[in-house]
Amino acid sequence: MKNIKKIIALVIAALMLAALASCNGTGTGTDNTTSPATGTADNTSKTYKVGICNYVDDASLNQIVANIKSQLEKIGTEKNVKFDIEYDNCNADKNVLSQIITNFVAEKVDLMVGVATPVATAMQAATAENKIPVVFSAVSDPMSVELVSSLEKPGANITGTSDFLNTDAIFDIMFAQNPDIKTVGLLYDVGQDSSATPIASAKAYLDKKGVAYKEYTGTTVDEVRLAAQSAVLDKVDAVFTPTDNTIMKSELSIYETFAQAKIPHYTGADSFALNGAFMGYGVDYANLGVETANMVADILINGKNPGDVPVMTFDNGTATVNTDICKELGLDYDAVAKTFAPFCTKVQPIQTAEEFEN
């Protein structure tokens, strides 16, 4: 009987020890689980999914995209976060654009970036209900296309960066270079919202100055090429194009037509000059991309409401002059730069190429 009692006592003691070990094990496990979880949150970066859509493959817009990506990568390293970027280009096709945005919504991106006005307006419409934040880039006149309520307080779920063009400044430069201009060709795509305001401003400027103008339009590269040839046949003295993506895409196909006819092409972006226009006047598109990325980070990392983030505009006083075209026009770059200087914050040279160097 005593042996049985001893056995029972030993069994009970063993069970009590097991219970104590179990309790202690649970407590230790909880501590270890919490600590690594906190450590994981601290040491492993949060990932934000960003959908970027470019409107068309041209030097200015490509430069914006490249700088958005590189700046987000830089911010990610500094802030210990990751940006999972989904990038696509609709190549000016509305159906493709719609599908790209639909895919972004289906993939549950945290934010969309629309490069150029048509992409931004399409994203605005697609996010009216789901309220996915949208940051636009290179939208010349966000007020006129009703992207924002005001530049200071955009409202809704959208904000961005604008490449607003000072059209009068371009014409001041044009007439400083050649006061004897009698007729100016206005080359643009009537379907580009970004061209509407600067073309209207150009007409008002020329009407006030008493200078004639003729309009030449095209929606494809072939149509733009024919329009350029028509301007040459009409013997215009100079040609103006705003920040028009259709003409930008066509510039490499038309610049020789103008240069051989000794007609200077004045445009609204440095990428035109890169692709063979005489002069491009406007914003620094590399910086535009950087600031667009900074906005994206401010919204995603800092929790800013897009509707409360003011639209960013820029000093657009940089004139980029193509030195190759200067020679073909019989002009001296140094003399041209001196003439342009009073109307610009900076005059810089460039040579004809397809893309900007990284």
Model segments located where?
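An alpha-beta-alpha
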Residues: V50, I68, T159-K209, N305, ...
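Extracytoplasmic "Venus flytrap"
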Residues: T44-S70, I75, E86-N95, G191-S195, ...
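Hydrophobic alpha-helical segments within soluble ligand-binding/sensing domains
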Residues: D42-N43, D141-T183, V283-K304
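Bacterial signal peptide processing site
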Residues: N24-T26
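C-terminal motif of bacterial Sec signal peptides marking the signal peptidase cleavage site
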Residues: A18-S22
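Hinge/cleft segment of the Venus flytrap/periplasmic-binding protein
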Residues: D298-N358
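Beta-alpha junction/loop-to-helix N-cap segments that form part of ligand/metal-binding clefts
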Residues: E86-S149, D244-A259, I263-G268
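Pocket-lining segment of extracytoplasmic ligand-binding domains
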Residues: D193-H265, A269
